[in-house]
């Protein structure tokens, strides 16, 4: 039986090493809105909104070791994509705030531009603007 979507997006959980740095990045720099803070058995979940998607930052009771960082360093989910408007302006702002780019603003095909950056733990975020 195929999955039946209850909403038009998926949510993502990211375990972080320093919740203050991560919230400063995702809320303060990217402007995501925090909608919930929930204590769980293994840490505190901080729910942030991007459109209809939830980005769930988990502040674990015990911080696990960091795995390999980079697009081609290990199998599994390697980056998160945000489809946005205003890529050039965002890139200018991120550069001004010292955010590390793994791929600067680049046209990957006519009408589609991307940029990739690292969050405070080295997780890679892709920003895409189409049209």
Locations of the language-model features?
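Vicinal oxygen chelate
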Residues: 1-10, 33-81, 92-118, 130-131
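Conserved beta-strand-loop-alpha-helix junction that forms the acyl-donor binding cleft
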Residues: 16-19
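Short, conserved charged micro-motifs
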Residues: 21, 87-90
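Conserved hydrophobic beta-strand within the GNAT/NAT acetyltransferase core sheet
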Residues: 12-14
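Short glycine-/small-residue motifs
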Residues: 124-127
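Conserved active-site tyrosine of GNAT-family acetyltransferases
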Residues: 22-27, 94, 122
């Amino acid at each position: 039986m195929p999955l039946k979507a209850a909403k038009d997006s998926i949510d993502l959980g990211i375990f972080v090493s320093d919740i203050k740095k991560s919230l400063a990045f995702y809320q303060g720099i990217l402007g995501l809105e925090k909608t919930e803070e929930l204590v769980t058995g293994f840490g505190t979940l901080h729910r942030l909104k991007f459109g209809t998607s939830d980005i769930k930052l988990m502040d674990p009771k015990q911080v696990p070791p960091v795995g390999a960082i980079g697009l081609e360093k290990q199998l599994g989910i390697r980056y998160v994509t945000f489809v946005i408007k205003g890529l050039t302006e965002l890139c200018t702002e991120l550069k001004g705030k010292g955010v590390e780019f793994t791929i600067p603003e680049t046209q990957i095909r006519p009408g589609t531009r991307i940029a990739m950056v690292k969050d405070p733990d080295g997780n890679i975020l892709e920003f895409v603007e189409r049209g």
